Amino acid sequence: MKYELVVGLEVHCQLNTASKAFCSCSAQFGKPANSNVCPVCLALPGALPVLNRRVVEDAVKLGLATGCAIAPHSVLARKNYFYPDLPKGYQISQFEEPICIEGHLMVDAGEGEKLIRLIRIHIEEDAGKSIHDIGDDTYIDVNRCGVPLLEIVSYPDIRTAKEASTYLQKLRQIVKYLGISDGNMEEGSLRCDANVSLRPVGDEEYGTRTEIKNMNSFKNVEKAIEFEAERHRGILEEGGTIVQETRLWDADKGETRSMRGKEFAHDYRYFPDPDLVPVLVDDEMLRRIRLELPEFPEARASRFVEQYGIPVYDAAVLTVEREMADYFEAVVEVAGDGKVSSNWVMGEVMRTLKEKYLDITAFSVAPSRLGGLIKLIGSGAISNTIAKQVFELMQQSEASAEEIVQREGLAQVSDTGEIERVVDEILAANPDQLAGYREGKVKLFGFFVGQCMARMKGKANPKVVNEVLQRKLEG
């Protein structure tokens, strides 16, 4: 029997607010354990939560970006369960009335675009963290308690592990473009749980699902789903029954292992939080937030192709990260040439970032400086070869390209008389090659060009060199 994979994803996106969701404690990652805490975080008697307005606005931004309907009235609820790192004994979340409903994402995992529907996006607070690797004891760090999250729940529309990771990458791209999260999976800013099941091909009814946790990279999401699908297939083909449970992905062993029985919604005994008023989103807030939305990757890539005349592939790569797209546009603004700017950013800049393990935001060559370098190439002041030398020197100081060219004496030589003198010397020093060229070995033209450029240390204007050589060789 042939089976079809069915996957739905629950993604927790940690918001980059300065303070937590329901108190004024810092939400900064990496602080000493239990230093970002207050009576609200610890659920001490009499401590009352107050919702962070920025959390609501970020939820609305993501909802609008994913085509959701925004609820004018939504309710915060208590999700009740016991866990050592949850001091309150409940988590503030949303249940029956979430803030965003019925959206979608378009993804392309290599087989054309596909629509993945979203059930909901809702506001939630994070729990604390259990630490098991200090001696034989377990410690609790509650710094993360109350850090704001958005949970994005998809319909089970995903049919391959690649689709799942592509969906997750697309979602990460959107939250980063919106500026609401850094989307860092390794630090837990973006966490993904996958609900996996199999069903016979052609069946409409879903099979029994298992939930997979602890996947901290796109590659691990793919591997975990593929492993779990094969585990299900093996059980079903042997006539067994799938147990509905939560399983942990072990990246070292490349397998999932049972964690606990899968809970149902009624196990959490949701009810509206009596300490928090309903969340209201009016038309004025929606109008304001719509105006604040950025130009998203697909639209920006299309504009790059049309406005700057660059290839579709280049535009897609340049718009993967908002910061890279911003950098490119700032370069073009100074350089005035979209195609050459694209070549430099896609080539020298990205190569340097990869070699030095840098992010574009930490790159030492500001876009205005790179734009200035490209202008020098366009004006004929320097050659492409010299420009690459200047680019390397620009990474070592704050000097402009023009200042470096003047300081190092790298200006391009276009003086016909000087170039003619060098060409005459090269031809005189290589009589055999000259004779060979005149006998029809035209590929030797490149040899003469190389000799001239080497003699003039790369500073000769290639166009003038070619013209002079052509004239001398044919004379």
UniProtKB/Swiss-Prot annotation:
Quaternary data: Heterotrimer of A, B and C subunits.
Keyword terms of this UniProt record: ATP-binding, Ligase, Nucleotide-binding, Protein biosynthesis
Function per UniProt: Allows the formation of correctly charged Asn-tRNA(Asn) or Gln-tRNA(Gln) through the transamidation of misacylated Asp-tRNA(Asn) or Glu-tRNA(Gln) in organisms which lack either or both of asparaginyl-tRNA or glutaminyl-tRNA synthetases. The reaction takes place in the presence of glutamine and ATP through an activated phospho-Asp-tRNA(Asn) or phospho-Glu-tRNA(Gln).
GO BP annotations, alphabetical order: glutaminyl-tRNAGln biosynthesis via transamidation; translation
UniProt protein name: Aspartyl/glutamyl-tRNA(Asn/Gln) amidotransferase subunit B
Organism of this sequence: Chlorobium luteolum (strain DSM 273 / BCRC 81028 / 2530) (Pelodictyon luteolum)
Annotated GO MF terms: asparaginyl-tRNA synthase (glutamine-hydrolyzing) activity; ATP binding; glutaminyl-tRNA synthase (glutamine-hydrolyzing) activity
Family, similarity comment: Belongs to the GatB/GatE family. GatB subfamily.
Domain of life: Bacteria
HAMAP family according to UniProt: GatB (MF_00121)
Keyword Calcium: no
PANTHER family: GLUTAMYL-TRNA GLN AMIDOTRANSFERASE SUBUNIT B MITOCHONDRIAL AND PROKARYOTIC PET112-RELATED, GLUTAMYL-TRNA(GLN) AMIDOTRANSFERASE SUBUNIT B, MITOCHONDRIAL
Catalytic activity: L-glutamyl-tRNA(Gln) + L-glutamine + ATP + H2O = L-glutaminyl-tRNA(Gln) + L-glutamate + ADP + phosphate + H(+); L-aspartyl-tRNA(Asn) + L-glutamine + ATP + H2O = L-asparaginyl-tRNA(Asn) + L-glutamate + ADP + phosphate + 2 H(+)
EC number per UniProt: 6.3.5.-
